[in-house]
């Protein structure tokens, strides 16, 4: 018996274990898990049936003058405000689909932060709600703000980027509500679009005009073609 105990003690010393009665076992150290990656995608395709079902009666009314065949459904990778990679959705006119895929690919590669890219239908087609959520969007069959004329958004030819930090500004009103602090463009703050901003430069390089240079109103979120 003494011989067995001596052997056990020797083994304990060799492996460095703690042989005290009641002592807890050492924790098992597992390999560190690899982070889960989000797929990188930049695609444009005709409007799928599932997306059409989401749009009808919301962003796409029954009396819309533009055909669904003239629109494209885009899936776009982007980096959100937390630095996390996401995949968003846009619907746009087929005439600018390639431009937008190229622009958003460049923004992604530069890790340009965008808070959200979701279809306006996720907000019931409500532009104010989408802007208040700082959501980047494109197609929405609606009229220009305060006017009878159709917006370029109704044709899928306009994109609003990070709208809360880049609001629509009139002398008497700022949209979205609550974004007045971002109306003064002489101030520096994160996510501001100006002529030195990468987003501005990319859209201009692809032939888009910017609402930030309009005279009667300024729409700093807005790019159209």
Task: Describe the function of each predicted region.
Residues 25-84:
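N-terminal module-boundary/linker segments of secreted carbohydrate-active enzymes
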Residues 118-155, 166-168:
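Active-site-adjacent loop/helix surface patches within enzyme catalytic domains
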Residues 13-14:
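Hydrophobic core
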Residues 36, 143-150, 155-225:
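Catalytic cores and adjacent binding grooves of peptidoglycan-active enzymes
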């Amino acid at each position: 018996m003494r011989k067995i105990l001596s052997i056990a003690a020797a083994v304990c010393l060799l492996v460095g274990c703690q042989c005290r009665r009641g002592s807890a076992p050492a924790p098992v150290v597992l390999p560190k898990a690899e982070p889960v990656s989000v797929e990188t995608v930049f695609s444009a395709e005709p409007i799928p049936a599932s997306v059409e079902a989401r749009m009808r009666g919301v962003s796409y009314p029954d009396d819309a003058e533009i055909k669904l065949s003239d629109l494209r459904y885009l899936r776009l990778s982007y980096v959100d405000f937390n630095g996390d990679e996401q995949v968003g959705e846009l619907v746009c006119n087929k005439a600018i689909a390639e431009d937008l895929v190229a622009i958003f690919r460049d923004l992604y590669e530069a890790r340009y932060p965008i808070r959200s890219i979701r279809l306006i239908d996720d907000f019931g087609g409500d532009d104010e709600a989408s802007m208040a959520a700082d959501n980047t969007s494109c197609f929405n069959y609606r009229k220009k703000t305060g006017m009878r004329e159709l917006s370029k958004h109704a044709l899928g030819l306009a994109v609003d980027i990070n709208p809360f930090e880049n609001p629509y500004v009139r002398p008497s009103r700022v949209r979205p509500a609550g974004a007045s602090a971002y109306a003064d463009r002489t101030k520096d703050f994160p996510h501001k679009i100006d002529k030195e901003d990468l987003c501005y430069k990319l859209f201009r390089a692809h032939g888009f005009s910017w609402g930030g240079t309009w005279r009667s109103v300024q729409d700093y979120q807005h790019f159209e073609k």
